[in-house]
Amino acid sequence: MGFRLSLLSLAVSLVALALAGVAIYRNTYEAMIMNNGSLLQNISPDIDSLESGEVSILILNDKKKNSDKYLSQQLTQESCVFSAVKGVVDSAIDNETRMGASLIRLHFHDCFVDGCDGGILLDDINGTFTGEQNSPPNNNSVRGFEVIAQAKQSVVDSCPNISVSCADILAIAARDSLAKLGGQTYTVALGRSDATTANFSGAINQLPAPSDNLTVQIQKFSDKNFTVREMVALAGAHTVGFARCSTVCTSGNVNPAAQLQCNCSATLTDSDLQQLDTTPAVFDKVYYDNLNNNQGIMFSDQVLTGNTTTAGFVTTYSNNVTVFLEDFAAAMIKMGNLPPSAGAQLEIRDVCSRVNPTSVASM
């Protein structure tokens, strides 16, 4: 009898265990369904493990720390570059105020021909390479090359192991020149590359000329994706600096109504200079005031008042210098981001006036 009771007790225990197993399986299965098929386990506190959420947080924290560290290093490097260039530019303008306008113009003449690629900085090589410097719009006209060379060397000396293109340095120099002369500063993003060539004929065909009528000017700026308003704003760069008498005070280039303002010798030598407005060392709105009074020096400037749309922008800038300065800064950012020609061979030049030894300059 006792033996039978033992067997019955054992059978009941086995049934109970089986039922418990079914219950556990059912609860686990339901938990999986409720959690989109993911089995959530409670890990015993005496096991030296971390839950997946904690692991993810640690990974994200590590990534953020690495990202913050990289960003901090990048900002430090960029700050070094900006400081090195600014020191050279400020010194150059202190020595010669006109240099500020020259650096702004140099940047414009670089970017407007096949994008901001430093092509204008390449020296000619006798018999093998003719670049943009001696193209008619630039010959004996664009200047400031020595300042860019000094700024490049300053970056090399002050910011070791930082590779910055000559095109970037030129963009920074133009921005700092504008600020130095009283214009509105703006952000210059780094990352441009230097071309291994330049475009002699492109400088002739793409750059605006003093003799261009309004239709031609609008087309040239439209080709670079500038609006008419941006074109009129960028023309305001002529509120600072000088131009050669032989360029602006000759028939076809000069505004006939303002020709008497030309303070040039009878021979019109390249050393004779004509200021472009009455405050050539200050970035202001006087240029537009002069246009409204039909006293713009260059023909291409004065024709801006000959069209209802462009004349409206001239009046806007003449009436509100703040609007002009804001529009000019925005247009300079856009110009400074003009990309190099598709398929152009690019590098970061060691010396701005020549391609690296591994490259070969070509027309």
Curated annotation (Swiss-Prot):
Disulfide bonds join C80-C159, C111-C116, C166-C352, C245-C264. Binds 2 calcium ions per subunit. One of its GO terms (biological process) is response to oxidative stress. GO terms for cellular component: extracellular region. GO terms for molecular function: heme binding; lactoperoxidase activity; metal ion binding. The keyword Secreted applies. This is Suberization-associated anionic peroxidase 2. It comes from Solanum lycopersicum (Tomato).
